[in-house]
Regions:
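Conserved structural scaffold segments of CAZyme catalytic domains across common CAZy folds
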Residues: 1-60, 331-332
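Solvent-exposed beta-strand/loop surfaces of large extracellular or lumenal domains
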Residues: 102, 300-320
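Solvent-exposed beta-hairpin/edge-strand motifs
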Residues: 289-305
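Conserved, mostly hydrophobic/aromatic
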Residues: 22, 102, 129, 213, ...
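Aromatic- and carboxylate-enriched substrate-binding clefts and catalytic-loop regions
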Residues: 33-203
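C-terminal beta-strand-rich structural cap/linker in extracellular carbohydrate-active enzymes
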Residues: 315-338
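Carbohydrate-binding surface patches
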Residues: 255-292, 333-336
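Catalytic cores of secreted or luminal carbohydrate-active enzymes
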Residues: 205-251
Length: 338
């Protein structure tokens, strides 16, 4: 909600639209973002949770860690053991399945201990956890597999904060797979096909490819419901069925900041994402030999005639030969091989 509506979670009807979007897109979860404790215009948080569950959408809820910036609430719900158990008990009883906890100021030992306390208690109440505005991944998922993802990245929310990401996003996005995302799940919130407070100049093909290139066990889609609803049918179907946990990953080509083609496998299906990080037209060339897909077919979603459109090709018969994909400046593509 935050990416499109700064204070949207104060508005019951706005958040309800995102739950309806999750139903339409067959996404199993929906996040109720910051300031839900001030919700009005048709209902409160209890009403929204009830509505979400009635539509078979599992709700997750945002919290301020209350350790640094005391801005959006709710505040001080999780800091003490007593308050945390009270809140987690309410969440579990209400049917909430996870928490997104935000605004951690530093890596001092007191905050590192706080992360572990949050995870330990969340496990007891069967709550998934997303740490936002947080430290980098540190392997905690090995001990706490309910830690689904962490931000620790200059992600898409910055289109709503400052203009700095607009000019740098393409190169930045092609650097992250070689750096930040190597060490753990990354809650970048990809897939911004329209504009927030500050515009993006990456293409729609680029934005779609981020959902494959960036790994996150919870992949948050940040754009407005009406934007996703207006996407071409085949693109919506792709986003509806996109996995978030993978069986294999292979780098097919790339160089940090310049370009990347990354393949991820779920079962027998390969998903390939390609990104152009430059301001020039570029052809991305790569071999399919590592994927062993000869005789299979491929659907491609790539840059159209301009940065706001897609070109979609279906049922391309494959060999193991080299592939060439043309990208617009700051462009990209997705391929699905079955």
């Amino acid at each position: 909600v935050y990416w499109a509506h700064n204070h949207g979670s104060k508005n019951f009807k706005i958040v309800k639209d995102y739950i309806d979007l999750a139903v339409d897109m067959k996404w199993p979860y929906s996040l109720i973002d910051a300031e839900w404790n001030e919700m009005s215009n048709g209902g409160d948080i209890e009403d929204l949770i009830t509505y979400s569950l009635s539509r078979n959408i599992k709700p997750m809820i945002w919290y301020n860690s209350s350790t640094a910036w005391m801005g959006p609430g709710p505040l001080y719900r999780l800091n003490s053991k007593e308050n945390r158990i009270k809140e987690y008990t309410w969440l579990q009883k209400s049917g909430v399945v996870g928490v997104k906890i935000d605004f951690f100021p530093d890596d001092y030992s007191s905050n590192m201990d706080y992360y572990i306390d949050l995870l330990e208690d969340a496990a007891k109440y069967k709550l998934m956890v997303n740490f936002h505005g947080a430290t980098i991944p540190r392997g905690w998922q090995r001990t706490y597999p309910h830690l689904m993802t962490m931000e620790a990245v200059y992600g898409a929310e910055w289109y709503n904060n400052k203009p700095i990401l607009t000019d740098r996003a393409a190169e930045h996005n092609v650097t992250l797979p070689f750096t930040r995302n190597v060490i753990g799940s990354m809650d970048y919130t990809p897939g911004t096909f329209s504009d927030s407070q500050h515009p993006h100049i990456t293409t729609c093909g680029h934005e779609l490819a981020l959902s494959v290139v960036f790994e996150s066990a919870l992949q948050h889609m940040p754009d407005r419901p009406e934007v996703y609803s207006s996407l071409p049918r085949k693109v919506r179907e792709f986003l509806s069925g996109l996995p978030t946990a993978w069986d294999d990953t292979k780098l097919l080509c790339g160089y940090p900041g310049a370009d990347i083609v990354l393949a991820r496998r779920k079962g027998d299906v390969w998903y390939i994402g390609g990104l152009n990080g430059t301001n020039e037209n570029k052809t991305l060339s790569f071999s399919l030999v590592p994927l062993q897909v000869e005789g299979k077919t491929m659907d491609v979603f790539k840059d159209g005639v301009d940065d706001k459109s897609f070109a979609i090709e279906e049922d391309i018969q494959l060999s193991n030969d080299k592939m060439d994909m043309s990208c617009l400046p700051r462009g990209g593509f997705v391929a699905v091989i079955k």
